[in-house]
Structure formats: C-alpha cells, structure tokens
Amino acid sequence: MIVRNLKYLSYELYRRLEARLWYSHVHYNHHDRRFELFFGWFGKRCDKPLEIYVSHAHNTWKDSSMTIQLVLNDEVLDSVVIYPGEEFPEHWFEILCATLGTIRDRDIL
C-alpha cells in the first residue's frame, strides 16, 4: 500500500489485523483522527477499547518527509520517517500482532 494519508494507513493496519483478531465494534474519531476498536478474545469483550492509531509527528518540508507514529493506548510503539510514494511499513503489522498477542496472553481483556 502506498502511503497517501493517515486515515488510509490506519485502515490498512485494521484490514490486516482482521484475519487474526475478532472485534465487535469499530469507531473512527474524526476529531482525533483515530480508530477505536472494541476487541474481544475467545468470546470475551473488554469494557475499554484498545486504541490503535497512526499519528503525524511532524513534517520536514525540505525533503517532504513525514514522521509518523504507531500508537497503542497512548504508548508509541514505533516511529518511522516516510517519503511521498513510500510503501506501508510492513513491520508495523508484526509489532501490533505481537503486542496484541501479549495483551491477550496476559488476559488483560
């Protein structure tokens, strides 16, 4: 996926996670530009949503690069500098799957 805007980058993460995770509700907050996912594991439902979103840290106008962050529940999991036309950061999918798997295994939900 070519990175064109943050909403589509966020959507790509969710689309890829769909195959591995069950969730009961998705809400897109236009004001904060973030998705809120209400996840469940093995039929359990959590009361508080897990928030996964892509935040825009800053632009560098000199070379048109943009720093974006992968955020889970207000914790920055990774930060990447991208340039126009660059591909989706593939390793983000693995980071999220590993992190969410850890959350499930600890039975926090």
For the regions a language model picked out, list residue spans one by one.
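Amphipathic alpha-helical segments
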Residues: N5-S24
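Ampiphathic alpha-helical segments that act as solvent-exposed interaction surfaces
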Residues: S10-L13, V71-L109
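Amphipathic, interaction-prone secondary-structure segments
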Residues: E18-L72
